[in-house]
Amino acid sequence: MIQTIESGIPGFDQLTVSELAEGGIPEKSTTLVYGPPKTGKSIFCNQFAYEGLLKQEPCLYVTTDQGLKQVQSNMMGFNWLIQSYIQNQTLYIIDGISQLSGTKFEDTNNLKSSSVGNPADMMVKVGIGTRSVYKKSNHFISILDSLNTLFAFNQEQMVIRILKAYLRRNREAGGTGLIAYTEGVTDSDTENELKSLFDNTIRLDGEYIRVESNFEDIDEVKSNESTYMITDKGIVVNGK
């Protein structure tokens, strides 16, 4: 039986139950959360991360689209309050966008500033962050939200190389990783290559959620689909 982590998203775990897995996000796997703009990709990632924090799962959170303060504000809108997890260092954040907007903050043990325009620096800080959360637990959650800005500031193949290194590091350390991406940011060939790098994909289109899991050990792809809603408490999946 494949071990999974409860998602904290009502209806999602029931949707993904199978004879192979208990339902939820497969533990120590990588998942691409993608779809058109404004369909709940960031909400899905944040909801999963917050559920983990509630259960004392350390989280490495890389934000490239919005600065730390905006991330906190967005999560607060769903009553997901993360300040205490920042203070107790369960949550480790790498802010890859605030430097570009001129917003400055002091680096701390678990808050690091970087730049999407300097992916080498980001990867160094991801390495440091991964070691930090791994020391707390040999299983943790990692979020990268999102690939969009990385593609905007760097050549596509460079981003793919960075992503491969990020995913490899995540797997080696035992992290369960979610990465967000908006369809159409790159060409179709790059998107297909992107999807092939992940163990699982979750597509949100504003009405339907489609989950595909590639179980390499048995050479089988499992697929599930349902409708979903975005509520004031986050995403709710309506069941099979």
Sequence positions of predicted segments:
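NTP-binding/hydrolysis catalytic cores, primarily Walker-type P-loop NTPases
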Residues: 1, 6, 27, 117, ...
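Loop/turn-to-beta-strand initiation segments
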Residues: 58, 90, 137-141, 172-180
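Phosphate-binding/switch loop-helix module in NTP-utilizing enzymes
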Residues: 99-165
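Catalytic-core regions built around general acid/base machinery
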Residues: 48-52, 129, 161-172
